[in-house]
Amino acid sequence: MAGVLIALLAIVVAEALLRRYVWRRPTDLRAVAASLVDALVRRGGDLLGLSMLAPLPAFAFAHRLATIRMESAAAWGVLYLLVEFAYYWHHRLTHRVRWFWASHSVHHSSNELVLASAVRLGWTGRLGGAVAFFTPLVWLGFPPQAVSGLVAAGLFWQFWLHADWMPRLGPLEWVLNTPAHHRVHHASNPEYLDCNYGSSLIVFDRLFGSFVALRDDIEIRYGLTTPVLSHNPVRIAFNEWLALARDVRAARGWRARVRVMFGPP
């Protein structure tokens, strides 16, 4: 995994330099550097095992309802759809529940869409435990390695969605989550907020009413609705957590505080 991370970070740096010095496109190299630091610190946390919910998949698999052998294309196809479904709802909740948004907002904090945006994921995501959304699949009987492998494959697909120079993909736009769909997802324009949550598929967005197509008549603005202008990785990582803490402290009564924490951002 370390080799994969090094390769991805090298691609991030190469794209940033190409954009700035060859393609002559505006590129914030300080923002790219902040994203690289974010990724390296998060990798350090991964090595330390800083996840409150890390034991969950092993516990669920030990008490699984069945044993599903991944020996057929059908088994892999079913698991792929279930992983995509779980990812869709987890991603949607990270936009609609402020506690989750406090971590996920880091990913949206870059004011441009470049490959560096793909590795800016913050340092607190594991404390919330996205793994909880995929653990039910392990409990059903799918091997944890198969589940985590498909999740990782989806994240690798999404890495390339952050390249704003990639063209539209024709008929594939109906089924797959594409760079065009992801540009909409990262936009802060009112017309584009809270949409296109899929991993590698866009079909669940179409089914559940969260799909928004890219429009040629709207100039995209990337980043948060209240932009983060700092290049300090620590400020970027905890910007929304501090805002959440201020709002919780200002709320009157425990019910109001719960609404602040678990209501929409």
What are these regions (language model features)?
Residues 16, 42-58, 231-234:
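Alpha-helical membrane-anchoring segments
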Residues 1-9:
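Hydrophobic transmembrane alpha-helical segments in integral membrane proteins
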